[in-house]
Regions:
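The beta1-alpha1 cofactor-binding region of Rossmann-like NAD(H)/NADP(H)-dependent oxidoreductases
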Residues: 52-53, 72-84, 112
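Alpha-helical segment proximal to the catalytic Tyr-Lys
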Residues: 135, 184-188, 247
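Residue(s) in the substrate-gating loop at a strand-loop-helix junction
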Residues: 155
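Active-site helix of classical SDR
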Residues: 130, 171, 179
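Substrate-binding pocket helix/loop in short-chain dehydrogenase/reductase
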Residues: 106-107, 114-119, 219
Length: 263
C-alpha cells in the first residue's frame, strides 16, 4: 500500500492547508494541544478562551513551531458575545468544541448552583458555539464542495455512568445526542459532525483528582490498557476527524478510553 505524504510527513488527506479552525477552551489542556496539532497540519487556528494570558502562551508556542494562530478572548457562557465573536470571523471551516467543566460530588449533594454551572458550559455553551460556527460555515459559497467539520469533545462518561459524576455524565450524553442529530441534519451541506470521547487524561484539569491515590487506583483498574491517557493520543484523532481523511465519517463518536467502555 502506498501512502501519499504531504508537507511535514502528514499523509496528504490529513493536511488542513487553507482551512480555518476554531478551538474553544483553547488556553490549556486538550484545547491547547489540539490548537498546536491543527496548526502542524496546516490550519489557520483561532484559539478561544476567557483568559488572555493562556491564549498568548498557546499562540506563541504555535508560531514558534512555524504554525499560524490567533487569540480570541471570549467567555463561551456569554451567548451574545460568543455569537458576535464567531459571526465576525472572515471564514470558518473547522470547529473543535471543547470548553467544559466537572464538579465531582454525590448525586444527593448537587446544588442548583453547580447544576446550572455545569449545564451552562457543557450543554448550553456547546450548543451556542456549534450553532454560531455552523452559521458562519454556511456563509461560504463553496461549502458543499469544500466541506466543513465539527468535533465535539465529550468524554467516555457520555457513554457510561459513574458515581459522583451524575451531572457531568448527563451533559456529556446530551452532547453525544447533539452530535448525532447535527451529523444527520448537516450532511446535505457536507458539514460533518463527530465527537471525541476520551478517558481520563494527564492534564491540568485532572491533576487535582489524581492527587487522591484511591481515585487514581479506581481509574487505572477500569482501564484495560492500565494507564492514563496522554494529550497526543487524543489530538491525533481530532485532526483526523477534522481532515479529508474522515470524509465519510459523521454522526458518530470516537471513544479513546483504553478499553473502559468495552467492559
Amino acid at each position: 500500500m502506498t501512502v501519499v505524504s504531504g508537507r511535514d510527513g502528514f499523509p496528504s488527506n490529513l493536511r488542513l492547508d487553507g482551512l480555518t479552525a476554531l478551538v474553544t477552551g483553547g488556553g490549556r489542556g486538550i484545547g491547547a494541544a489540539t490548537a498546536s496539532a491543527l496548526a502542524c497540519a496546516g490550519a489557520q487556528v483561532l484559539v478561544m478562551s476567557r483568559t488572555r494570558s493562556d491564549l498568548d502562551q498557546v499562540v506563541a508556542s504555535v508560531e514558534a513551531s512555524g504554525g499560524k494562530a490567533s487569540a480570541l478572548v471570549c467567555d463561551v457562557t456569554d451567548s451574545v458575545r460568543t455569537r458576535e465573536t464567531i459571526a465576525a470571523l472572515p471564514r470558518l471551516d473547522i470547529l473543535i468544541n471543547n470548553a467544559g467543566i466537572n464538579i465531582p460530588e454525590a448525586f444527593v449533594d448537587v446544588s442548583l448552583e453547580h447544576l446550572d454551572a455545569i449545564i451552562n458550559l457543557n450543554v448550553r455553551a456547546m450548543f451556542v458555539v456549534a450553532q454560531a460556527a455552523v452559521r458562519k460555515m454556511l456563509e461560504f459559497p463553496q461549502r458543499r464542495e469544500v466541506g466543513g467539520a465539527v468535533v465535539n469533545i465529550t468524554s467516555q462518561m457520555g457513554h457510561v455512568g459513574a458515581a459522583r459524576r451524575t451531572v457531568y455524565c448527563m451533559t456529556k450524553h446530551a452532547i453525544e445526542g447533539l452530535t448525532k442529530a447535527m451529523g444527520v441534519e448537516l450532511a446535505p451541506q457536507n458539514i460533518r459532525v463527530n465527537s471525541v470521547a476520551p478517558t481520563f487524561l494527564d492534564t491540568p484539569f485532572t491533576v487535582p483528582f489524581f492527587k487522591d491515590p484511591k481515585f487514581k487506583d479506581w481509574v487505572l483498574q477500569r482501564i484495560p490498557l492500565g494507564r492514563i491517557g496522554q494529550l497526543e493520543e487524543v489530538t491525533g484523532a481530532i485532526v483526523f476527524l477534522a481532515s479529508p481523511a474522515a470524509s465519510l465519517i459523521t454522526g458518530t463518536s470516537l471513544v479513546i478510553d483504553g478499553g473502559w467502555t468495552a467492559q
